[in-house]
């Protein structure tokens, strides 16, 4: 019921996209229907080459649909000029190129270009918006730092601040966590989620980072070859099994119990007992080592940690795996 009351910031209806190669037409995506809601962080996921970049180009007005239409708040993007689109959609690309001697403050101020023109003269309102963008992304202290002298994570926050200063109702980001470490990836995605929720913006992120997307996204768009775009809450898509449409073949599956991508579990022929969390990690290590059969029962204990295998006892999983491998292939 709540979804019917949500504000639709962007909508695609019966969208077919492709390009011309020499004299032939190559269709990439067909009959797509989707809605992007204000106040939500939506993650677009799919294998390489499935058409994610093509879809983003269409949303940005860079390519025209063969069929169907894209609407921004009920207006067709084909009726909006470049300047108007720039005021409505803020974009952060994967590897933007900016002069290394440009400061963070100068970069963020560029976000006001669609509103000031290329003269770049900021009035008091523009300056307030730039300051707010720096504050909202918690990088005010970096205002005078050069882009070449800050970390990748800080640079990505500066790019997001520039997009905030642009003040579009839609924000589109292409792999914003690429090249970042684990903590920074979480931090950037949490920042984008907060921006969507607190500022009522519709935020669309193209990503391959499934684990972090599950933790932060309000909605997923799933794309795969030959199938319609699937939209839904990550949790609904996991429970229904639709999340597995992202996975090739049957080698991998998404574990509903553990909330992560795993190799398809092989037929394991051994008995293991002990505290649940210790059993899980011990079993995982044995499976990863390619060992499918252990003749004696395994007992895992903690405080202190130990693993018993018949009369043998080990104080680490590493020791157990080493021993099991010797039993399988004693020559080594």
Report each predicted region and the residues it spans:
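The feature captures the beta-strand-to-loop junction immediately N-terminal to the Walker
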Residues: 45-47
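Helix-to-loop junction immediately C-terminal to a conserved catalytic motif
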Residues: 60
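Conserved ABC transporter NBD signature motif
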Residues: 68-76
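Conserved ABC ATPase signature
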Residues: 146-150, 154
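Catalytic Walker B motif of ABC-type/P-loop ATPase nucleotide-binding domains
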Residues: 171-175
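ABC ATPase nucleotide-binding domains
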Residues: 249-331
């Amino acid at each position: 019921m709540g979804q019917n009351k949500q504000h639709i910031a962007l909508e695609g209806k019966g969208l077919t996209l492709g390009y011309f190669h020499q004299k032939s037409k190559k269709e990439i995506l067909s009959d797509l229907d989707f809605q992007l809601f204000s106040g939500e962080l939506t993650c677009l996921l799919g294998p390489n080459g499935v058409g994610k970049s093509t879809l983003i180009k269409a949303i940005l007005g860079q390519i025209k649909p063969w069929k169907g239409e894209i609407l921004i708040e009920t207006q067709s993007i084909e009726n909006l000029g470049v300047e108007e689109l720039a005021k409505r959609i803020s974009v952060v690309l994967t590897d933007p190129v900016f002069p290394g001697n440009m400061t963070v403050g100068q970069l963020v101020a560029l976000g006001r270009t669609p509103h000031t023109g290329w003269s770049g003269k900021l009035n008091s309102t523009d300056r307030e918006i730039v300051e707010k963008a720096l504050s909202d992304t918690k990088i005010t202290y970096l205002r005078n730092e050069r882009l070449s002298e800050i970390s990748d994570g800080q640079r990505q926050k500066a790019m997001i601040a520039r997009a905030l200063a642009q003040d579009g109702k839609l924000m589109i980001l292409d792999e914003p966590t690429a090249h970042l470490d684990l903590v920074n990836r979480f931090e950037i995605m949490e920042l984008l989620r907060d921006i969507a929720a607190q500022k009522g913006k519709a935020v669309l992120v193209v990503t391959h980072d499934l684990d972090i997307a599950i933790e932060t996204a309000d909605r997923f768009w799933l794309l795969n070859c030959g199938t319609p775009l699937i939209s839904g809450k990550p949790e609904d898509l996991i429970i229904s099994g639709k999340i597995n449409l992202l996975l090739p073949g049957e080698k991998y599956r998404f574990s509903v119990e553990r909330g992560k991508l795993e190799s398809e579990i092989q037929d394991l022929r051994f008995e293991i007992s002990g505290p649940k969390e210790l059993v899980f990690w011990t079993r995982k290590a044995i499976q990863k080592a390619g060992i499918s059969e252990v003749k004696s029962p395994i007992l895992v204990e903690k405080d202190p940690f130990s693993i018993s295998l018949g009369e043998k006892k080990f104080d680490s999983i590493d020791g157990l795996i080493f021993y099991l491998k010797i039993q399988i292939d004693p020559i080594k």
